[in-house]
Amino acid sequence: MKVAVLGAAGGIGQALALLLKNQLPAGSELSLYDIAPVTPGVAADLSHIPTQVRVKGFAGEDPSPALKDADVVLISAGVARKPGMDRSDLFNVNAGIVRNLIEKVAQNCPKALIGIITNPVNTTVAIAAEVLKKAGVYDKKRLFGVTTLDIIRANTFVAELKGKDPQTTNVPVIGGHSGVTILPLLSQVAGVSFTDEEVAALTKRIQNAGTEVVEAKAGGGSATLSMGQAAARFGLSLIRALNGEKDVIECTYTEGDGEHARFFAQPVRLGKNGVEEYLPIGQLSDFEKQSLNGMLDVLKKDIILGEEFINK
């Protein structure tokens, strides 16, 4: 099994690569690419960790050598948020980066499962889809926006509030991956109940958690360690599904039946070809229904921005 990480010298990329070196199945190959010349050194550094995962590092303009025959590609390349920016401010730089990388994915590993981490995910996934479509290799079941950070944050915050174990707390999060488009389904969390005030406060905190980290880092970056953890969890779920494990379920931002928007984060069952089954979002509370209806215009605009970036 070959996993490629694009943007591997960045804060998220290095955290992700460290976790994958430690957690990928024995015999896997971890292929690291970044435009930064330090990347082969990151690979050398990781290669000293005693696990049966081979690591190779590639730098420079062309990611092709890193991508050749990859089974899974995780893309974290791009600029990070600074205080005062929201994820959509990143669009101007990151849109072009994602386009260029996905063009190379289409050429070198068109059947790979692709996880997009680069923000703004609501838009960059649409960009990736349109690039793959133009190349004649788009399969909607193989392209994912990694929204797992919203899930792990929701699990953590709910567990903290209710005195539960965060590792056994499971909060589904649907919609998108920025601001109001992030919708935690708190009404579906087993074994806990919330007041209306708690729901409003928790929802807001989960939606704004990225900003909380950006501000706490005081200009020194955005969420890299928790995002690395989230991306590793999602990447390892893809690998488990590729290896034939049954009932691997994750929430992810993907092109489904289009009921709410062309791309929408929802629970899916993963399999050898990517999405095996789109799972229902279940019963929503009145607050959740209202929040869902209220965010769809924002989400759809984000998607159109990505489509038009490629098709204009």
UniProtKB/Swiss-Prot annotation:
Domain of life: Bacteria
Residue numbers binding substrate: 81, 87, 119, 153
Residues annotated to bind NAD(+): 7-13, 34, 94, 117-119, 227
GO molecular function, one term: L-malate dehydrogenase (NAD+) activity
Catalytic center residues: 177 (proton acceptor)
Keyword annotations from UniProtKB, A to Z: NAD, Oxidoreductase, Tricarboxylic acid cycle
Record-listed E.C. numbers: 1.1.1.37
SUPFAM superfamilies: LDH C-terminal domain-like (SSF56327), NAD(P)-binding Rossmann-fold domains (SSF51735)
Statement: the UniProt record of this protein carries the keyword Chloroplast: no
CC annotations in GO: cytoplasm
Pfam family, one: Ldh_1_C
Catalytic activity: (S)-malate + NAD(+) = oxaloacetate + NADH + H(+)
SS bond list: none
One biological process term in Gene Ontology: tricarboxylic acid cycle
Family matches, as PANTHER family: MALATE AND LACTATE DEHYDROGENASE, MALATE DEHYDROGENASE, MITOCHONDRIAL
Assembly: Homodimer.
HAMAP family in alphabetical order: Malate_dehydrog_1 (MF_01516)
Family of this protein: Belongs to the LDH/MDH superfamily. MDH type 1 family.
Name of the protein this chain belongs to: Malate dehydrogenase
